[in-house]
Amino acid sequence: MNNEIITGLLLPFLGTTAGSACVFFMKHELSRNVQRMLAGFAAGVMTAASVWSLIIPAMELAEGMGRLSFIPAVAGFWFGVLFLLLLDTVIPHLHMNAEKAEGVPSKLARTTMMVLAVTLHNIPEGMAVGIVYAGLLHGTAEMSSGGAFALALGIAIQNFPEGAIISMPLRAEGKKKSAAFGGGVLSGAVEPAGALLTILFSSLILPAMPYLLSFAAGAMIYVVVEELIPEISEGEHSNIGVIMFSVGFTVMMALDTALG
């Protein structure tokens, strides 16, 4: 595993860590409008990454293998949606600004369930980076070094506000700054771990690469629709979330087309 791949795997985690560090510099919890802006931006990045970095390469890869391109894309996408739906149903977690936890009944602390909610969010992102770099490692023609880096960088950019979104509310819940920072960092640790595991098993998953790429896309779109869009539209009406969604979408689209 070369330095390029190691950098790509660590970039998203560094984005979360940097965002979590905001708890040391900001005195007050993020305002509702700021949370909307950050959630909108993250949703835009994830949606664009799902299309340009995952679904389109999945279809191109399937076509190169002599398969009907839409079948792996559709099947993998649905597997990703159903997988996140299963995790969402089983794992106890608490979304930002929510009073009632989701998942199986649990006596876990509110702060723990808040971290679990963001951790669920980060699972498909880690898988997406790992799958793309696994394809690059094995010389898959549809995977370029620039495209893989664009995906990792795009996720790192949207992880920065996510780190702040988790650490600041933890601080507001009464946690010490160091503990709030640690919670944010912990929520992002699943990304490099998941990406590394994907690469370690890359020789086994290579034939299923089109399905896995679209699987990651389906999981990411599930997170956007189930978690981020409600955050954008919650409370008093505002267009700022939609504007920031568009900004995030165009940033990720530009990154992928420029570097890919």
Locations of the language-model features?
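Intrinsically disordered, metal-sensing/regulatory segments
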Residues: 1-260
